[in-house]
Curated annotation (Swiss-Prot):
HAMAP family: Ribosomal_bL27
Propeptide feature ranges: 1-9
Gene symbol of the encoding locus: rpmA
Example GO BP: translation
Cellular component, GO annotation: cytosolic large ribosomal subunit
Organism listed in the record: Syntrophomonas wolfei subsp. wolfei (strain DSM 2245B / Goettingen)
Description of post-translational modifications: The N-terminus is cleaved by ribosomal processing cysteine protease Prp.
Protein name according to UniProt: Large ribosomal subunit protein bL27
Highest taxon listed in the record's lineage: Bacteria
UniProt xrefs under InterPro entries: Ribosomal_bL27, Ribosomal_bL27_CS
Length: 97
């Protein structure tokens, strides 16, 4: 007669993949033009997510919350109330001789 000798040995069933090993590209956010710098119309002043810094005089806000100058002038960072910041652009004083 036939006899079956069934033996089960340890073996590796499958190898899982690591959940690490990827990273998103940096978004290069932050202040691009600082207080006192001279800018031209259209220059980006701040790249941000949300309104950490609010637009002041002569500054507009883009669809992705980017702040940009709408006139040529000098950048000025100011407080807006107690806990908010804003950035404005003031026209350069023309000097006559």
């Amino acid at each position: 007669m036939f006899t079956f000798d069934l033996q089960l040995f340890a073996h590796k069933k499958g190898v899982g993949s690591s959940k690490n090993g990827r990273d998103s590209q940096s978004k290069r956010l932050g202040v691009k033009r600082y207080d006192g710098q001279i800018v031209t119309a259209g220059n980006i002043l701040v790249r941000q997510r949300g309104t950490k810094i609010h637009p002041g005089q002569n500054v507009m806000i883009g669809g992705d919350d980017t702040l940009f100058a709408i006139i040529d002038g000098r950048v000025k960072f100011e407080r807006k109330g107690r806990d908010k910041k804003q950035v404005s652009v003031y026209p350069l004083e023309t000097m006559t001789m």
